[in-house]
Each structure stands twice: as C-alpha cells, then as structure tokens.
Amino acid sequence: MSETKPASSKPAAAAKPKKVIPRVSRTGEPKSKPESRSARAGITFPVSRVDRLLREGRFAPRVESTAPVYLAAVLEYLVFEILELAHNTCSISKKTRITPQHINWAVGNDLELNSLFQHVTIAYGGVLPTPQQSTGEKKKKPSKKAAEGSSQIY
C-alpha cells in the first residue's frame, strides 16, 4: 500500500518576491539612501565619532553641527601630511614599513610640524640627531700686531 507520488513536471514553487515599497519623503519625492556625515563631507575621518567626543568631553556647553565636520577634516589633513612625510622618510631608508621612528623623523624635519609637536613625545620614536653647539666662545687668534707689540726685549 505504499504509494509513491508521481514526479511532477512543474518546478518547485518559487518564493514570491517581497513587494518593495519605495521610500518617499513628505513632499512625495523618492528618498535617497541615508549617507553618513563623513561621506557627505567627502572625508575619511568619522564625523560622528568626533562629534560624540566633543560632546562627551565637555569642551563647551554647546557644539555647532559644523564643528565636528571641520575638526575631522583638519585631523585628516594633519594625518595625511605626517604619513606622506613618513612615507618619504621610509622610502629614503629603503624600508617598506613605516615605524614610529620614521614618523618622528618626518615631524622633526618639517618646520611647521616640528613647532606644532614641539612638546610631544612619540613612543618608540628614538632621538633626532641635532648639531652639537659649543658651550664656550670661540677662541680668537692673536693678531700679528698684538703679537709683535707684546714682545719685550731685555
């Protein structure tokens, strides 16, 4: 009494696609995908994180909405400059990996960055070589006239 079902010639019932409801704004225009503030500003650094840190840090009672965007852009520019100089230093020394020492050399050899990071210590950055300055004044050579005039004949 075991009955087997005959093989049907129809393929298995395909799942019906879900009906997509278009996103529409209040005015009836189609909404675009949500975009991050970093993407809207065209920068890589996270604007939302900078905003959160500004608000949690209590640097000011109020933070304008454009302040974290500007600060993130400035931070991204500084990091780009430092990494570019460190890359140049790294390629001069024929290395493929940027180390803290390369960053320290890059910052130390650039006048503007050196003045900005004057009181900053980079961990494992090493020490920059500086020219030795003599503590005393240079000795003057006695002039010929002074040497001739000082000799006494007895």
UniProtKB/Swiss-Prot annotation:
Compositionally biased residues, Basic and acidic residues: 26-38
Processing after translation: Phosphorylated at Ser-151 to form H2AS128ph (gamma-H2AX) in response to DNA double-strand breaks (DSBs) generated by exogenous genotoxic agents and by stalled replication forks. Phosphorylation is dependent on the DNA damage checkpoint kinase atr1 and/or possibly dnapkcs, spreads on either side of a detected DSB site and may mark the surrounding chromatin for recruitment of proteins required for DNA damage signaling and repair. Gamma-H2AX is removed from the DNA prior to the strand invasion-primer extension step of the repair process and subsequently dephosphorylated.
Region (Disordered): 1-41, 128-154
Gene Ontology CC entries for this record: nucleosome; nucleus
Phosphoserine: residues bearing it: 151
Comp. bias regions, Low complexity: 1-15
InterPro entries named among the record's database cross-references: Histone-fold, Histone_H2A, Histone_H2A/H2B/H3, Histone_H2A_C
Main localization, broad class: nucleus
Residue positions of motif [ST]-Q motif: 151-152
UniProt keywords, alphabetically: Chromosome, DNA damage, DNA repair, DNA-binding, Nucleosome core, Nucleus, Phosphoprotein
GO molecular function: DNA binding; protein heterodimerization activity; structural constituent of chromatin
GO biological process, one term: chromatin remodeling
Pfam families, per database record: Histone, Histone_H2A_C
Subcellular locations according to the entry: Nucleus; Chromosome
Assembly, per entry: The nucleosome is a histone octamer containing two molecules each of H2A, H2B, H3 and H4 assembled in one H3-H4 heterotetramer and two H2A-H2B heterodimers. The octamer wraps approximately 147 bp of DNA.
Free-text comment about domains: The [ST]-Q motif constitutes a recognition sequence for kinases from the PI3/PI4-kinase family.
Function: Core component of nucleosome which plays a central role in DNA double strand break (DSB) repair. Nucleosomes wrap and compact DNA into chromatin, limiting DNA accessibility to the cellular machineries which require DNA as a template. Histones thereby play a central role in transcription regulation, DNA repair, DNA replication and chromosomal stability. DNA accessibility is regulated via a complex set of post-translational modifications of histones, also called histone code, and nucleosome remodeling.
PANTHER family named in the record: HISTONE H2A
Similarity annotation: Belongs to the histone H2A family.
Annotated protein name in UniProt: Histone H2AX
Gene: H2AX
